[in-house]
Amino acid sequence: MNIIEGSFEAKGKKFAIVVSRFNHFIVDSLLDGAVDALKRHGNVNDEDITIVRVPGAYELPLAAKKIAKKGEADAIIAIGAVIRGGTPHFDFVAGESNKGLAQVCLESEIPVSFGVITTDSIEQAIERAGTKAGNKGAEAALGALEMVNVLAQI
Protein backbone atom coordinates (compact mmCIF):
# COMPACT_ATOMS: atom_id res chain seq x y z
CA MET A 1 0.00 0.00 0.00
CA ASN A 2 1.33 3.42 -0.96
CA ILE A 3 0.22 6.32 1.23
CA ILE A 4 0.94 9.86 0.11
CA GLU A 5 0.99 12.51 2.82
CA GLY A 6 2.29 16.01 2.90
CA SER A 7 4.70 17.59 5.30
CA PHE A 8 5.21 21.22 6.18
CA GLU A 9 8.85 21.54 5.03
CA ALA A 10 8.99 23.78 1.97
CA LYS A 11 12.41 25.41 1.86
CA GLY A 12 13.00 26.83 -1.62
CA LYS A 13 9.32 26.78 -2.56
CA LYS A 14 7.61 30.04 -3.58
CA PHE A 15 4.41 31.27 -1.97
CA ALA A 16 2.14 34.13 -2.95
CA ILE A 17 -0.23 35.57 -0.38
CA VAL A 18 -3.12 37.55 -1.86
CA VAL A 19 -4.54 39.80 0.84
CA SER A 20 -7.70 41.88 0.99
CA ARG A 21 -7.26 45.40 2.40
CA PHE A 22 -10.92 45.63 3.48
CA ASN A 23 -11.30 44.94 7.22
CA HIS A 24 -7.53 45.40 7.49
CA PHE A 25 -7.66 45.44 11.30
CA ILE A 26 -8.61 41.74 11.10
CA VAL A 27 -6.80 40.81 7.89
CA ASP A 28 -3.43 42.09 9.12
CA SER A 29 -3.51 39.53 11.96
CA LEU A 30 -4.42 36.77 9.49
CA LEU A 31 -1.51 37.81 7.26
CA ASP A 32 0.91 37.83 10.21
CA GLY A 33 -0.26 34.32 11.12
CA ALA A 34 0.23 33.07 7.56
CA VAL A 35 3.74 34.51 7.23
CA ASP A 36 4.72 33.16 10.64
CA ALA A 37 3.46 29.67 9.75
CA LEU A 38 5.33 29.66 6.43
CA LYS A 39 8.58 30.66 8.13
CA ARG A 40 8.30 28.65 11.31
CA HIS A 41 6.73 25.43 10.05
CA GLY A 42 7.77 25.48 6.39
CA ASN A 43 11.26 26.94 6.76
CA VAL A 44 10.33 29.41 3.98
CA ASN A 45 12.59 32.44 3.49
CA ASP A 46 11.34 36.04 3.14
CA GLU A 47 12.48 36.21 -0.48
CA ASP A 48 10.24 33.24 -1.31
CA ILE A 49 7.09 35.00 -0.08
CA THR A 50 5.28 37.56 -2.25
CA ILE A 51 2.42 39.56 -0.74
CA VAL A 52 -0.16 41.06 -3.11
CA ARG A 53 -2.72 43.47 -1.66
CA VAL A 54 -6.10 43.87 -3.34
CA PRO A 55 -9.07 46.08 -2.37
CA GLY A 56 -11.42 43.38 -1.08
CA ALA A 57 -12.29 39.69 -0.97
CA TYR A 58 -14.14 39.94 -4.28
CA GLU A 59 -10.85 40.82 -6.03
CA LEU A 60 -8.88 37.90 -4.57
CA PRO A 61 -9.71 35.38 -7.34
CA LEU A 62 -8.55 37.61 -10.20
CA ALA A 63 -5.22 38.36 -8.52
CA ALA A 64 -4.79 34.66 -7.68
CA LYS A 65 -5.51 33.71 -11.29
CA LYS A 66 -2.91 36.19 -12.60
CA ILE A 67 -0.32 34.84 -10.15
CA ALA A 68 -1.13 31.25 -11.13
CA LYS A 69 -0.79 32.06 -14.84
CA LYS A 70 2.69 33.51 -14.29
CA GLY A 71 3.76 30.16 -12.84
CA GLU A 72 6.13 31.67 -10.29
CA ALA A 73 4.34 30.45 -7.15
CA ASP A 74 4.17 26.89 -5.89
CA ALA A 75 1.08 27.79 -3.86
CA ILE A 76 -1.22 30.75 -3.30
CA ILE A 77 -2.78 31.71 0.01
CA ALA A 78 -5.86 33.94 -0.15
CA ILE A 79 -6.59 36.00 2.95
CA GLY A 80 -9.55 38.22 3.72
CA ALA A 81 -12.38 38.91 6.13
CA VAL A 82 -16.01 39.20 5.10
CA ILE A 83 -18.24 40.26 7.99
CA ARG A 84 -22.02 40.03 7.66
CA GLY A 85 -23.88 43.31 7.61
CA GLY A 86 -27.51 44.23 7.20
CA THR A 87 -27.67 43.58 3.44
CA PRO A 88 -27.18 40.53 1.18
CA HIS A 89 -23.80 41.95 0.05
CA PHE A 90 -22.04 39.51 2.41
CA ASP A 91 -23.52 36.49 0.63
CA PHE A 92 -22.48 37.70 -2.82
CA VAL A 93 -18.92 38.63 -1.84
CA ALA A 94 -18.26 35.52 0.26
CA GLY A 95 -19.77 33.15 -2.29
CA GLU A 96 -18.08 34.59 -5.36
CA SER A 97 -14.71 34.84 -3.63
CA ASN A 98 -14.90 31.21 -2.57
CA LYS A 99 -16.10 30.02 -5.97
CA GLY A 100 -13.50 32.04 -7.86
CA LEU A 101 -10.60 30.84 -5.72
CA ALA A 102 -11.69 27.22 -6.08
CA GLN A 103 -11.86 27.67 -9.85
CA VAL A 104 -8.31 29.09 -9.95
CA CYS A 105 -7.06 26.12 -7.94
CA LEU A 106 -8.70 23.52 -10.15
CA GLU A 107 -7.81 25.16 -13.46
CA SER A 108 -4.20 25.98 -12.60
CA GLU A 109 -3.47 22.84 -10.57
CA ILE A 110 -1.69 25.09 -8.08
CA PRO A 111 -2.83 24.91 -4.45
CA VAL A 112 -4.95 27.93 -3.52
CA SER A 113 -5.49 27.85 0.21
CA PHE A 114 -8.64 29.57 1.52
CA GLY A 115 -7.88 31.92 4.39
CA VAL A 116 -10.94 34.11 3.94
CA ILE A 117 -12.95 34.21 7.13
CA THR A 118 -16.69 34.75 6.87
CA THR A 119 -18.35 35.75 10.12
CA ASP A 120 -21.56 37.16 11.50
CA SER A 121 -19.80 39.71 13.71
CA ILE A 122 -16.57 41.58 14.31
CA GLU A 123 -16.18 39.61 17.55
CA GLN A 124 -16.21 36.31 15.64
CA ALA A 125 -13.67 37.72 13.18
CA ILE A 126 -11.35 38.76 16.01
CA GLU A 127 -11.62 35.26 17.51
CA ARG A 128 -10.58 33.70 14.19
CA ALA A 129 -7.70 36.12 13.69
CA GLY A 130 -5.58 34.85 16.54
CA THR A 131 -7.50 34.81 19.80
CA LYS A 132 -9.97 32.13 20.94
CA ALA A 133 -10.40 30.24 17.65
CA GLY A 134 -6.78 30.22 16.50
CA ASN A 135 -5.50 32.09 13.46
CA LYS A 136 -7.19 31.11 10.20
CA GLY A 137 -4.38 32.75 8.20
CA ALA A 138 -1.87 30.41 9.82
CA GLU A 139 -4.17 27.45 9.15
CA ALA A 140 -4.43 28.42 5.48
CA ALA A 141 -0.64 28.63 5.23
CA LEU A 142 -0.26 25.17 6.80
CA GLY A 143 -2.71 23.81 4.25
CA ALA A 144 -0.70 25.37 1.43
CA LEU A 145 2.55 23.90 2.78
CA GLU A 146 1.05 20.44 2.99
CA MET A 147 -0.57 20.55 -0.45
CA VAL A 148 2.67 21.63 -2.14
CA ASN A 149 4.28 18.47 -0.77
CA VAL A 150 1.33 16.19 -1.51
CA LEU A 151 1.10 17.31 -5.14
CA ALA A 152 4.85 16.88 -5.61
CA GLN A 153 4.44 13.19 -4.72
CA ILE A 154 1.44 12.40 -6.91
From Swiss-Prot:
Catalysed transformations (reactions): (2S)-2-hydroxy-3-oxobutyl phosphate + 5-amino-6-(D-ribitylamino)uracil = 6,7-dimethyl-8-(1-D-ribityl)lumazine + phosphate + 2 H2O + H(+)
GO biological process: riboflavin biosynthetic process
Catalytic residues, chain numbering: H89
Listed CDD domains: Lumazine_synthase-I (cd09209)
Stored InterPro entries: LS (IPR034964), LS/RS (IPR002180), LS/RS_sf (IPR036467)
Gene3D superfamilies referenced in this protein's UniProt entry, alphabetically: Lumazine/riboflavin synthase
GO cellular component: cytosol; riboflavin synthase complex
Positions contributing to 5-amino-6-(D-ribitylamino)uracil binding: F22, A57, Y58, E59, A81, V82, I83, F114
Functional description taken from the UniProt entry: Catalyzes the formation of 6,7-dimethyl-8-ribityllumazine by condensation of 5-amino-6-(D-ribitylamino)uracil with 3,4-dihydroxy-2-butanone 4-phosphate. This is the penultimate step in the biosynthesis of riboflavin.
Listed name of the protein: 6,7-dimethyl-8-ribityllumazine synthase
Natural source organism: Colwellia psychrerythraea (strain 34H / ATCC BAA-681) (Vibrio psychroerythus)
